[in-house]
Design a protein with these regions (language model features):
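HIT superfamily nucleotide-processing domains
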Residues: 1-105
Length: 105
């Protein structure tokens, strides 16, 4: 796995603690509960491998990563019964592939 010691998602520890709490791991990703919970259940699904873009993954990795994202969305639906889950993949400040999953209010 590619690793960047300066990346919050790779290094975890104090870098990650600033904004989130790691709550689980899936085959291709880490699941992080976002500390700012203006939308209850807001989580981040971050790729275990340090890549900037989904196109940097192999086809098999891409399929598994999206399976992980879908699995987390299913759990959010079970827990919160939202009308919709919003998926955000900005990549503007964190150059590590991750999705924000935010339920509607």
């Amino acid at each position: 796995m590619v690793y960047d010691e300066n990346c919050s998602y790779c290094a975890e520890g104090a870098l990650l603690d600033a904004f989130g709490i790691k709550i689980g791991e899936l085959p291709m990703s880490k699941v992080i509960l976002f500390k700012e919970q203006s939308h209850r259940g807001r989580v981040i699904v971050a790729c275990k491998r340090h890549v900037d873009d989904i196109t940097d993954l192999t086809k098999e990795e891409r399929i598994q990563f999206m399976e992980d994202v879908s699995h987390v969305a299913e759990i959010l639906h079970e827990l919160f019964h939202p009308d919709k889950i919003n998926f955000g993949a900005y990549g503007d400040t964190m150059h590590h592939l991750h999705f924000h999953l935010v339920r509607d209010v």
